[in-house]
Amino acid sequence: MGEHNLLNPGFVGPLVNIHTGDTFYFPNFRPSGGQLPGLPSLSYPRRDNVCSLPWNPSEPCNGYSQSYFSSPVSINPSFNRSCEITRADDGKCYYNNGSGSRENCSGGGSLKREDRARDTSALTSDHGMHAGIGSTVAFSKYDYGTEQLTQDPPSCQSMESDSSSSLLNEASKPSSSDTQTLVSPGSHTGTITASGAAPWYPMHTRTRKKRKPYSKLQLAELEGEFMMNEFITRQRRRELSDRLNLSDQQVKIWFQNRRMKKKRLMLREQALAYF
C-alpha cells in the first residue's frame, strides 16, 4: 500500500481522473476548460512559458487551447494587459473587422480572419440571393423588355454630334422660308411657311387694316369746320360723321392731328423769324 501523500501520483491521479504517472495536476490549480470529473479523460497539452516576461505578471496568461472549441480561445479575449509587450508598430499589419477596431493579422489571427471571411462570404451570398429574388419580382412587375435594358446609352460625343446636325438642319430650313417671306412680304399674312412650321415672328400673323385715305370732298368739309372751330363738339362731330360717311372716331382723330400740325407750323414760323 502506498502512503497517502499529496505528491504521490497514484493517489492524486484517480482523484482528477488522470492516469499518467509522470504528470500530476492539483484540483485547485486547474486551468480554464480543464477536465471535469464527470467527463472522460482528455489529454490537455501543457503550454509553458506563455508569457516570457522578466517579471511575474499580476494576472495569469490564460492561453490554453480547449479541444471542444473550433479554435483556441483565451479567457481574456479583449486585451491581455499583462501579456502585451510594447513594441514598434512598424512590424505589425492590421485589418479592420467592420466595427472600426484593429486586429493583428499575425499568429492566431489568421484563423479568425479565415472564419470571418467565410462568414462574410455566406452573408453576401444570402444577401445576393435575397436581392436577386427582389430584383426579379421588381422586374416582373415593371417589365420593359431586355433590349431596352441591355442597350448601352449613347456617348456624349454622339449626342453632341446628333444635336449639332439637327440644329444645322433646322437652321437651314428657316433660311429658305425667310427668303420666300422677304420676296413677298404682303402675301404671308395668315399663311404658313413652306417648311410646315409656324412663322418666326408673331407680327407676321397680325392683319393690319389697310389705310383708307380721305377723299377731297371729305378733306374740304373737315378743313372748313376746322377753320371755324378748332375744337369740335360731340354733336357737331356726329353730324359730320353722318354726312361724310365717316366714323365718329375718324373725325375725332383728324381734328387732333390737325391741331398738332397747326402747332408745328407755328413753332417753325417762330424759329425762322428768330434766326
Curated annotation (Swiss-Prot):
GO molecular function: DNA-binding transcription factor activity, RNA polymerase II-specific; sequence-specific double-stranded DNA binding
Biased composition (Polar residues): 178-194
Similarity comment: Belongs to the Abd-B homeobox family.
Major subcellular site: nucleus
Organism for this UniProt entry: Takifugu rubripes (Japanese pufferfish)
Biased composition (Low complexity): 155-177
The UniProt record lists the keyword Transmembrane: no
Residue ranges of DNA binding: 207-266
PANTHER family referenced in this protein's UniProt entry, alphabetically: HOMEOBOX PROTEIN HOX-C12 (PTHR46440:SF2), HOMEOBOX PROTEIN HOX-D12-RELATED (PTHR46440)
Entry-linked InterPro entries: HD, HD_metazoa, Homeobox_CS, Homeodomain-like_sf
Its biological purpose: Sequence-specific transcription factor which is part of a developmental regulatory system that provides cells with specific positional identities on the anterior-posterior axis.
Bilayer-crossing regions: none
Annotated region described as Disordered, given as residue ranges: 101-129, 148-213
Protein name: Homeobox protein Hox-C12a
